[in-house]
Amino acid sequence: NQAWSIDITYIPIRHGFLYLTAVIDWYSRCIVGWEVDDTLDTRMVINALKKAFAVSKPQILNSDQGCQFTSQQYVDFVKENGIRQSMDGKSRWADNIMIERWFRSFKYEEAYLTLYNNIKEARSAIGRYVHTYNFERCHSALDYKTPAECYYPAMLLPYVA
């Protein structure tokens, strides 16, 4: 919970696109919050953060310089939750590499292989993918543990002492 990244990507569906906001913990690579909507706006981003904040909050929240992340509503929401906002340099996608890499995996392993008919179908599939990713997929960078195995025990460390 030291640093998280947040970003938005497009998801193709039968009649257009949906937008997926995802939040990832840098240490564990756990997806700690997400939201999908057919409208690209700040409300969707804040809803993803509210889901993540229901479990915990980071010290730092990194994003790109997209209009949702520079909006006064977003800036105020992050500040009100006691979180330091961090932003990538202009056109520096690698600054947010954790979430960009997760989006790549999600798209090539799920979204590009399935043509969703509607938002309900997409939301269900995304939920299954996130669950599998967090709780079943082992990562070599995590000593072959799942993101959830690294994230949830790490949350308890300040309370153990």
Regions found by a protein language model. Give the residues of each.
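Charged DNA-binding/catalytic regions of mobile-element recombinases
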Residues: 1-161
